[in-house]
Structures are given as structure tokens and as C-alpha cells.
Amino acid sequence: MGKYLEKVFRLSQYGTNLKTEMIAGITTFVTMAYVLATVPNMLGNAGLNKSAVMTAVILLIVITTCAMAFYTNRPFALAPGLGSTGIVVSMITNEGISPEKAAGVIFLSGILFIAISFLGLREAVVKVIPVSLKHAVSAGIGLFIALLGAKSCGLIAASEKKNCLTFGDLRSPEVILCLIEFCLMLLVKIKNIPGGIILSILITTIAGIPLGVTKLPDRIISFPGKMDDIFLNIDIKGALNTAYIPFLIALFIPDFFSTFGTVLGVGAKAGYLDEKGNLPGIEKCFQVDAVSTSVGALFGIPSMTTYLESSAGVEAGGKTGLTVIFTGICFLLMLFFSPIVLMIPTAATAPVLIYIGIHMLGAMKNIDYSDMTEYMPAFLCIGFTIFANNIANGICIAIPVYVLMKLISGKVKEIQPVMYIVTAICILYFITLI
């Protein structure tokens, strides 16, 4: 077994081992397990069979994540995107589009992804993105992850009175537990304790029981629901209606840029990027991501995408695809033991996201602050990822501004021709938001 794992995942080449990869894989699983509570609930509220959706989500995560592991040897885990899930729910509940046609739109989005990914167009776009913007994407994702963690535990909350973000209830048990675990994480990192992230999550989960933060499940074992109601329940012909083009664009463009941003961000965290900010073998990651979206549509599940929480496994020492093989195994067990993992409170996973997000801000030091045409678009990328609460929004604002500033400053030669096409796509994306 050891020789097989070494041959497939090249553990010694990446300076890792089976134990480290296992701990990292479990860490990734714990930080993204919330998807099992959110996606089935969201689609269930839209009229889909919640039990069937839960089974489909688990199986898709396992299959697509393991495909990523074996095909790319990268520690990237996939799951249904919450943004695309929200769009699909809106299509069904607000626009009156049937779940079958919504699945058809998702499928067409995936086919479009497959076409541009296997033709190498997606990789070409990434290569022409300026180095400063690539580093800005990594930093922006870091802030996005940190804010996501802070909001999930209630440390940061939206104030209706002030119409802005502010501190939540600092006296709440969730916030107190979150802050204590964050300090605990700093301690285990300073002391370099193996498995420190998992240990801190476990301690916080147990500590949350007497405080009422950790809700004990009423049962331990669950059984997978049948997928008869959703499998191949798809209307591709009906989805070809031109009226659905805005929804196709709304699914396609954000996922395109979010995936590119996530892969580069997590890749930077893992030390995979070359001196130009490119990720070797990124086309394989895109290909898996693209095929996964179309496969997911066959189950009525929104766009499968690479998850930011993969960075938690990287922080725990994960270097290869073996990391997410263990993530996949953990999710597979959830077909029968989902109540156990769903008891882990957000107060236990939020500090992990905050810690990782802070670490990813290190990418900002690589931005050229002596050239306004470089640092201004980079700032907008980082800022609007947070201000507009979306990775794609930050990227789609930064690219047109970069091109415009280079044109105004007379630095036309620094603009790759493909950047004009990418700029047009970004503008098209914002038109769909109007």
C-alpha cells in the first residue's frame, strides 16, 4: 500500500507522509462539512427532496474530489457552490422555472466549462492575468475567508441601523468560544503541535456542550435517501430557451472567476505557484471542475466548484491529492453518520477560517506599490471581494480597471491581447447584474 501511495501521490517528493495527509484531509472535511447542512436545506426549501439531495451531494463530493486527487494530485476538494445554489433556488422559487429546466441550465453551464477547459482557453485566461492581480486574488480570498469565519460565529454582524458590518454580541457563548479557540490555535501553531487544528476544533466542540453551543444529535446513525426523484430529472431542451441566457451567464461567469481565484489562492498557500504566479497543471484542475458541474446537473445539484476550505487542509500540512482522498472518505461515511459531524458548531470552525485568511494576506507583499497601474487594480480586487461579498466581483472590477489604467498611462504594450476579451466578459457580467 505504501509503495502504491508513493507512486501515485509522490509523497516524498512533496515532503509529506501518510499521517500528515490524513490529518490535513480530516481538517478540510471538518471545515467544509457545513455544506451538508446548507445545500440540502436550500434546495429542499425550493421543493426538491431534501433526503435525496443530501445523498446526491455526499456522493458527488466524494466522486469529484477523488477525481481531482487522482487526476491532478492537488489537495483541492469540490462541493456544490453556495452562490450557484442560491441562484438556482431563486430561479425555481422567484422566477417559476421548473427544477428540471434549472438542472438543464446548470448542465449547459457545465458543457460550456468543459469546452473552454479542454480547449485550454481557461488556462490561457489565467496566464494573461497580471502577476499583481494574481497576488491580489490570493489576498482578497484571504480576507474573504477571514470575514466568512467572523460572520459565521457572530463575531461580525450586519447592523441594520448603521447599514454596515459591526461587532456582533461579544457576550454570546458562540463568540467567546470562537475567540478562545483562536487563541488556542495560535498556541498550537507556535508550539508546532501536530494536528493542532483538529485538536482545537475538537476541544471547542466539547466545550460548547455545557454552553448550549454544541447541539447533541438525537441519533447517531442515518441512512441515505433514494435519489429516484432527482437523478436524470433534467430538461436540457427546455433550458435552451433564450430567456434563460441571463441565468446561464450568472452561473457561468462567477464560477469561472471564483474557481480560478480559489485554485490560485489555495495553490499560493501551498507554495505551488511559479515566479509568474501561475499554477503548473492548472488546466487539469479546471477540467475536473468543469466535468463535475455537468455531472452534478444530472442529479439536479448546482455547480460543483473547488472549495476555499481546501486551504484548511493545506494549513494542516496537506501537499498532495492524498489529502482530499481522506476528505472524500470522511464524506462517504456521512451517508450513515451525518448527525455526528453536523453537531460541530460554527464557533469551532470559524477560528480556523479566520486564521487561514490572515495567513493568506502575505501575498500582498508581492504587489508592486511603486506603480499605480499595478497597485490600484490590485487594491480594487481585494477591496471589492470584501465590499461586494463575492470573489468574482473583485476580479471582474479589477481587470477592466487594469486595462483602462494601462491605456491611459500609455503602457499599451503591457496589456496582453486576450485581456481585452476578458475585459469584455467582465463588463458583460456586470450588465447581467443590472
Task: Describe each region flagged by the PLM.
Residues 43, 71, 188, 296, ...:
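Helix-capping/transition residues at the boundaries of transmembrane alpha-helices
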Residues 16, 20, 32, 36, ...:
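Electropositive phosphate-/nucleotide-binding environments in soluble metabolic enzymes
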Residues 95-210, 214, 325-434:
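Membrane-embedded alpha-helical modules
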Residues 55, 104-107, 249, 287, ...:
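Internal alpha-helical transmembrane segments of multi-pass membrane proteins, especially GPCRs
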